[in-house]
Amino acid sequence: MTTSDLVDLDRLTAFRYGILTWVDKEGFPFSVATDFVLSENGEILLKKPNVPVLLPRDRVAVLFNHITGIPTGGYTDRRYMLVWGKVTEDKGFLKLYPEELSEWDEKILPFDKLCAEAAPQGKKYLASIQPSIEA
């Protein structure tokens, strides 16, 4: 499986940075923001963060997210991609090998529907009213 089989690279380019997260050898979570680029081959290359702890290679998460504040209050344009996988070091970068993905974009699935679908009762309700919405 290639990166582009799991991750929509066009949508990924809409994000400006990623938050690299892992669990250290003592069992504590550690997170650091880092820049990223896509290689010509469609590989996700994270700028190697300068951190004083050992970065594991076998299991990391990278959160790419965006949110726009509304001056009068509230938020819009919310979206995220959470990619779990492995990394290898490559010329000052960490090459991400995606294994799992979860994502949400409110332009695709509005927030109220996301909340309703997250709850079993909400899913049943949406299924029951869907025919009347499509009519």
Outline where the language-model segments fall.
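Binding-site signature for planar aromatic cofactors or substrates
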Residues: 1-135
